[in-house]
Amino acid sequence: MHNFEEELTCPICYSIFEDPRVLPCSHTFCRNCLENVLQASGNFYIWRPLRIPLKCPNCRSIIEIASTGIESLPVNFALRAIIEKYQQEDHPDVVTCPEHYRQPLNVYCLLDKKLVCGHCLTIGQHHGHPIDDLQSAYLKEKDTPQKLLKQLTDTHWTDITRLIEKLEEQKCHSEKIVQGDKEVVLQYFKELIDTLEQKKKYFLAALCDVGKMINQEYTPQIQGMKEIREQQLELMTITTSLQDESPLKFLEKIDEVRQRVQMLKQRPLPEVQPVEIYPRVSNVLKEEWSRIEIGRIKKAVIPEMRVSSKRTPCSWSDNDEKEMELFKILNIAIVSLISVILMLILLFNHHIITFLNEITSICFSEVFLSVYQSLSKNLYDLNNTVCYTLYLLKEFMWKIVSR
């Protein structure tokens, strides 16, 4: 605390003097502080009711004051003037209490370990706490920074520094791992997308080839039928015009027209048979590719698609009762045998292929997958061939029986 400020502080409340009063012993105190001391003493002489004894809080001498109490003590006008002038000036080097206006922090509270003002000790939250003056408190705590500095430089903090370095190193290592994984993910899906794009191109190219096959299958037939149609229309025009010709020209042309019509009618017509595309891409994608593991897509085989004439199905839809009865009588043994063979083929083709589809997605390697797809195609061709052969055999036997 500033020396000059200390002279303006009440020794009882440790605040700047308020209404300072002078005792006969020349010591000065706040009026309120003296009233509190007087009330606390309770010393009254019965035989001298006009005088009230008071012990000076500073020198401990007994003095007597008038019965009017502390108001009878003279005011220390000189000190009050100095205080008023002091309070009007700015003192940046003096720290004041944030809770009590213009009261200096001139006392150290031992309980709360902080600076307080006189008001904090008398009417504030530090009332009744043990206190010490600033100089004594400073001397007691003067060596504390060295002790704290020693604590802050021991091995504990060295371990913390090492721990920070280790954590930073682990963080950097983990971030590198994450970054590496990101690059792996990007590369993996890039290769996967490239593979899928390549497979898509292969599928589309195969379908384009199938389209060319279909065009080669139907275009010549359609063109031939269009030529026949054009010749028909031409002959119709010629035939119509002959009716207006003279008998001579009519007879000259009619035989030629007749021969052309007969030749046109005798011209063989192609047998219209629907073609079948095998395998169907939708079935391949649904039944085979949907079960392929992602890691095997790159080695997955694109099936060879073909276009072939659709065979007569292995079924009979003849509603003629006599024909069916005769056929049953003459061919009961053969039909029974054929039925058994047909059931075995169809059963094998349905269940075994389904089973192979399931096994393929789980444990088949790329080589077995290719073999499986080839086997599936061959089974399909075998099924169609057998059905068509049975159909021809049935037609042949029916012709023999009919004769």
Curated annotation (Swiss-Prot):
Source superkingdom: Eukaryota
Keywords: Coiled coil, Endoplasmic reticulum, Membrane, Metal-binding, Transferase, Transmembrane, Transmembrane helix, Ubl conjugation pathway, Zinc, Zinc-finger
Subcellular location: Endoplasmic reticulum membrane
Observed effect of gene inactivation: TRIM59-deficiency causes early embryonic lethality. Affects the expression of gastrulation-associated genes during early embryonic development.
GO annotations of cellular component type: endoplasmic reticulum; endoplasmic reticulum membrane
Any matching Pfam family: zf-RING_UBOX
Assembly and oligomerization: Interacts with ECSIT.
Protein name according to UniProt: Tripartite motif-containing protein 59
Gene source species: Mus musculus
Gene: Trim59
